[in-house]
Amino acid sequence: RDCQEKWEYCIVPILGFVYCCPGLICGPFVCV
């Protein structure tokens, strides 16, 4: 899903956890 909070974690299996901003999708991975 899209990020809803300012610093919400996205899961990227290769890089581990990364931050993303509200309303953004982390590359091919979505926020959890």
Curated annotation (Swiss-Prot):
Subcellular location: Secreted
UniProt remark on domains: The presence of a 'disulfide through disulfide knot' structurally defines this protein as a knottin. The cysteine framework is VI/VII (C-C-CC-C-C).
Effect of V18A: 2-fold decrease in potency to inhibit human Nav1.8/SCN10A sodium channels
Anything else known: On Nav1.8/SCN10A, the mutant (E5K,E8K)MfVIA causes a small left shift in the voltage dependence of activation and the voltage dependence of inactivation. In addition, it inserts more deeply into the membranes than the wild-type toxin. In vivo, the mutant (E5K,E8K)MfVIA is analgesic in a formalin-induced mouse pain model.
Gene Ontology MF terms in the entry: sodium channel regulator activity; toxin activity
Top-level taxon of the source organism: Eukaryota
Keywords: Disulfide bond, Ion channel impairing toxin, Knottin, Neurotoxin, Secreted, Toxin, Voltage-gated sodium channel impairing toxin
Protein name: MuO-conotoxin MfVIA
Function comment: MuO-conotoxins are gating-modifier toxins that inhibit sodium current by trapping the domain II voltage sensor in the closed position to prevent opening of the sodium channel. This toxin shows high activity on Nav1.4/SCN4A (IC(50)=81 nM) and Nav1.8/SCN10A (IC(50)=96-529 nM). It also shows low activity on other sodium channels (Nav1.5/SCN5A, IC(50)=431-3900 nM > Nav1.1/SCN1A, IC(50)=3.3 uM; Nav1.2/SCN2A, IC(50)=5.1-6.3 uM; Nav1.3/SCN3A, IC(50)=2.2 uM; Nav1.6/SCN8A, IC(50)=1.2-4.6 uM; Nav1.7/SCN9A, IC(50)=2.3-5.5 uM).
Tissue expression remark: Expressed by the venom duct.
Disulfide bond positions: C3-C21, C10-C26, C20-C31
Organism: Conus magnificus
GO annotation, cellular component aspect: extracellular region
